[in-house]
């Protein structure tokens, strides 16, 4: 009798634990964030291809796509382009690009996008080919048609304010329902590299609304992870599915943040003695790189600290290569040789440990993430069927 009683107690304890785990998975909000970095977008593209392949394997579904698993996908600059590629619908209302299509896209179009215009005084590239290929690939698709919530940043140089394109903002600000092609060019229009982008939409009253936009990195400084999280948090006010992360309850947040690599040579290149003699011109050449590196580091530090304090460190994964050298550090070197090197960087990164304190490789961590994403999707699907 005692044995039977003990077995029943153990059974109900397991059942309660399982139910609790299921509830957490069901309520979990999933976020994917992709950094900016020009042609270095090849690195996160390799990571996305691996992750999507794992999701297809886990769910035994070759048609599985990243947009099926993430509640919010955000990006800036080249990360904004990747966001659009994996969330913009085709004629069958499925993502027009699989993750495996992204690297070939860079190889086909990168050399034409980063084709020096020959201008000494203007931007390095005229942006015409970039706009042409965006219009060709994304067509007339607008923000509201994205297959999941998106968060793509830009900066308006006329109003001096950041502009964040998301589906959740459209009810209050319908003028933000811009074409994805305009948004992608705008978030990639880095000052000195591409010309700023002008376009117009209509307000709810039918009035003309003008945009004068440059690179989203000006607004979010390359790493859009916090922006993507804030969009997910704001959605909690309107969508019951997001209620679990209200008041920044990161325990129910599953965040994957992909970097485009940092320059290991940068810190070694300059010393205090050397820079003490610098003037405005020398500082202008490196200040943006310094600011982006510092901001990206602080974003990762903040998120890591928050998740660790909540004992939810496995819910956050930052995938970043911190040892880029030579031509791979350049955002606009679209030579075939350099792109091949970037592919190698991405593939080698999968085999590297997540950190000095965590021997788990990125490949292993992404497999774990894929299982969580798959389980959570199944739990939600089962709930919806009742």
Swiss-Prot record:
UniProt-listed Pfam families: Patatin
Q: Name one GO biological process term.
A: lipid catabolic process
Specify the domain of life of the species encoding this protein: Eukaryota
| Cellular compartment(s) | Vacuole
What the entry lists under InterPro entries is as follows: Acyl_Trfase/lysoPLipase, PNPLA_dom
Q: Which residues form the active site?
A: 77 (nucleophile), 215 (proton acceptor)
Where does this chain carry the motif DGA/G? Answer: 215-217
**Motif annotated as GXSXG, chain positions:** 75-79
Entry-listed glycosylation sites: 115, 202
| PNPLA domain span | 32-229
UniProt note on tissues of expression: Tuber.
Q: Where is this motif: GXGXXG?
A: 36-41
Please state which protein family the record places this protein in: Belongs to the patatin family.
Protein name in the entry: Patatin-07
């Amino acid at each position: 009798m005692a044995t039977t009683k003990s077995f029943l107690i153990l059974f109900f304890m397991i059942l309660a634990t399982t139910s609790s785990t299921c509830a957490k998975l069901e309520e979990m909000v999933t976020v994917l964030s992709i950094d900016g970095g020009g042609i270095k977008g090849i690195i996160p593209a390799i990571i996305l291809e691996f992750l999507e392949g794992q999701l297809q394997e886990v769910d035994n579904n070759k048609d599985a796509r990243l947009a099926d698993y993430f509640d919010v996908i955000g990006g800036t600059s080249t990360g904004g382009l990747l966001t659009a590629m994996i969330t913009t619908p085709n004629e069958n209302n499925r993502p027009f690009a699989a993750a495996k299509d992204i690297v070939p896209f860079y190889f086909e179009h990168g050399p034409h996008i980063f084709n020096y215009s020959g201008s000494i005084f203007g931007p390095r590239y005229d942006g015409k080919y970039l706009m042409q290929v965006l219009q060709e690939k994304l067509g007339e698709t607008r923000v509201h048609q994205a297959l999941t919530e998106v968060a793509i940043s830009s900066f308006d140089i006329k109003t001096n304010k950041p502009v964040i394109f998301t589906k959740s903002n459209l009810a209050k600000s319908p003028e933000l329902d811009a074409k994805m092609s305009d948004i992608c060019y705008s978030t990639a229009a880095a000052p000195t590299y591409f010309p700023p982008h002008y376009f117009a939409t209509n307000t709810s009253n039918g009035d003309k609304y003008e945009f004068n936009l440059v690179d989203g990195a000006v607004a979010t400084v390359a790493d859009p992870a916090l922006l993507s999280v804030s969009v997910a948090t704001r959605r909690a006010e309107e969508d019951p599915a997001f209620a679990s992360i209200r008041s920044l309850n990161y325990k129910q947040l599953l965040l994957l943040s992909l970097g485009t690599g940092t320059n290991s040579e940068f810190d070694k290149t300059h010393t205090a003695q050397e820079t003490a003699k610098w003037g405005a011109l020398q500082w202008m050449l490196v200040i943006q790189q310094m600011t982006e590196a510092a901001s990206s580091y602080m974003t990762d530090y903040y998120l890591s600290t928050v998740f660790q304090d909540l004992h939810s460190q496995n819910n956050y994964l930052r995938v970043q290569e911190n040892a880029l050298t030579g031509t791979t550090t350049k955002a606009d070197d679209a030579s075939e040789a350099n792109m091949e090197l970037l592919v190698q960087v991405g593939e080698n990164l999968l085999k590297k440990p997540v950190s000095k304190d965590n021997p788990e490789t990125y490949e292993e961590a992404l497999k774990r993430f894929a299982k969580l994403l798959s389980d959570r999707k199944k739990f939600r699907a089962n709930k919806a069927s009742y």
